[in-house]
Amino acid sequence: MAVQRTFSIIKPDAVAKNVIGEITTRFEKAGLKVVASKLKQLSKAEAEGFYAEHSARGFFGDLVAFMISGPVVVQVLEGENAIALNRELMGATNPKEAAAGTIRADFAESIDANAVHGSDSEAAAAREISYFFAATEVTAR
């Protein structure tokens, strides 16, 4: 397996619950390294741009409103098979369907307020990382 980078957002609901450290610890215990991180209040334009692929879908307005409802933590994670590993750690999008012990099963409230976002492919990871981080802000460790 190759070392990959993936993008993660700890969403407003999880930030409000003060579980940033608990979520990040799960990434690290699984072998992922945080190589970039920012606590950030997204603007409406940033949220709309980030989720542009969903702009024609009915939930887009609610998604944008949720993502700007409070601060988020944007992170770049690095490790062996990082994209798949992060998705496994997160669990199913709907926390009611997420396996016990996953981040969403433990911290998410609903399919909308589902605690975390993670890249679903190498192409998405590259796009999402560059959306929030300059190359000089990502530091190998």
Curated annotation (Swiss-Prot):
The keyword Transferase applies. The active site is at residue 117. One of its GO terms (molecular function) is ATP binding. It catalyses: a 2'-deoxyribonucleoside 5'-diphosphate + ATP = a 2'-deoxyribonucleoside 5'-triphosphate + ADP; a ribonucleoside 5'-diphosphate + ATP = a ribonucleoside 5'-triphosphate + ADP. One of its GO terms (biological process) is GTP biosynthetic process. It is found in: Cytoplasm. Its cofactor is Mg(2+). ATP binds at residues 11, 59, 87, 93, 104, 114. Keywords: ATP-binding, Cytoplasm, Kinase, Magnesium, Metal-binding, Nucleotide metabolism, Nucleotide-binding, Phosphoprotein, Transferase. Its EC number is 2.7.4.6. Pfam families: NDK (PF00334). Gene3D superfamilies: Nucleoside diphosphate kinase-like domain. GO terms for cellular component: cytoplasm. Belongs to the NDK family. Homotetramer. Major role in the synthesis of nucleoside triphosphates other than ATP. The ATP gamma phosphate is transferred to the NDP beta phosphate via a ping-pong mechanism, using a phosphorylated active-site intermediate. This is Nucleoside diphosphate kinase.
